[in-house]
Design a protein with these regions (language model features):
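Beta->alpha loop/short-helix hinge microenvironment recognizer with preference
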Residues: 1-234
């Protein structure tokens, strides 16, 4: 029995070889990602050969270098983490996750560039707004944000992971520490919800919509929902 966990490539190859995917239903970009991952480090990508003077040969198949491929982006990810570690301070940091309601997913998919920009901008705005309040910090914080678009079950699930400094600099340049508690989750959740939906409704490219009334109804429904914001020390 093979206990090895399947990789994304294993899954893609399985559905391709068993005719379980209709590539014609994918966008051009999605088809490229799918095909690149299937070929990554396979013979069709070409190879480099190491040869020892003793006659031993070792073949290395080339990577696809697609930004969405988890295999050949691993080094870049580790390089990014190492680079950002040089900018960390000897302070407390908090891990904050912002998740969008699934009702908005169809509209995010219609215009991902706008949807993701809206998510980044309003998350940053919400965090900075609370940080400037003397009741919480009264200063300017640091934020590193990373977008995730998949859930653990491989479904479309856009959410933002943020590493937030446990404190900030006030107008006098003094450091205000926040070691035990960042912001009330409920307050942050409501503020984020309001900022996101306000921007989303006002600036969404309406030319992409077939039914504006339905869009407005979905936005109104999301106003009444509790939005998921999660925070803890990383």
């Amino acid at each position: 029995m093979n206990d090895k966990k399947p990789t994304i490539q294993d899954i893609f190859l399985y559905v391709r070889d068993n005719d379980l995917v209709n590539l014609s239903r994918l966008t051009k970009k999605q088809r490229k990602v799918f095909n690149d991952i299937c070929r990554c480090r396979k013979q069709e990508m070409g190879c480099n050969t190491e040869k020892c003077t003793c006659g031993y040969k070792r073949i290395h198949y080339n990577s696809c270098r697609n930004p969405s491929c988890p295999m050949c982006q691993r080094f870049k990810r580790e390089e990014w983490v190492d680079k950002n570690n040089h900018y960390t301070l000897n302070i407390t940091y908090y891990h904050v996750v912002f998740t969008l309601p699934e009702e908005l997913n169809p509209y995010i998919l219609l215009d991902k560039r706008f949807g993701y920009r809206c998510l980044f901008d309003t998350v940053s705005d919400a965090l900075k707004t609370l940080a400037k309040d003397p009741k919480y910090i009264g200063g300017t914080i640091g934020i590193t944000a990373v977008l995730h678009t998949w859930s653990s079950t491989m479904g479309f699930h856009p959410h933002l992971h943020c590493i937030v400094s446990g404190g900030g600099y006030n107008q006098s340049g003094e450091w205000i520490s926040k070691d035990k508690f960042l912001f009330p989750v409920l307050v942050l959740s409501k503020l984020f919800r309001g900022k996101f939906l306000d921007t989303f409704k006002k600036e969404y490219p309406l030319r992409r919509l077939n039914n504006i009334t339905e869009f407005n109804n979905v936005v109104s429904e999301c106003c009444e929902k509790d939005w998921v914001v999660y925070t803890k020390e990383p």
